[in-house]
Amino acid sequence: MKNLIFLFFSIFITSLAFCQNTSETKNASQDIINLISSYSTSRDTKDTVLLKKILTKDIDQLVSSGVWRKGIAQAVQGMMESSTSNPGDRTLKVESIRFLNPNVALVDARYEIKNEDGTVRKMWSTFAVVSEKEQWKISAIRNMLPAGN
């Protein structure tokens, strides 16, 4: 009987742990979606203060043209130059979030820029995001063109 009670208790405790992780993952997922939305907003409004708040100091970015931006200063400068030279409405739609551990996730998003002439540039973006002091930040960005473009 003791073994049966122990088994039941073990299963119950394990299920509680998984329920908590699911709830935490849902909360973290929403925080990450909000982070990507803030990134999009900061690019559209050219808000460097917001960008510096949501990017890690050692961020690196590989843009679709093959150019690397390393470090927050280079990344912010390049993002502002790109937003100015490639105007249009930017849309980032998160397609998937994969947690590598509770503090690191990979985020895949569809990235579209609607140009002033009505054409749409369609790309993919992958973000590596990390939780620093209970705030999610972008640590790396990879922009790529889909095959066939």
Predicted regions span which residues?
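A short gly/proline-enriched turn/hairpin at secondary-structure junctions
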Residues: I59-K70, E81-S85
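Short beta-strand edge/turn micro-motifs at domain boundaries
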Residues: K122-N149
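Hydrophobic pocket/interface hotspot
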Residues: Y39, L51-K52, I59, G71, ...
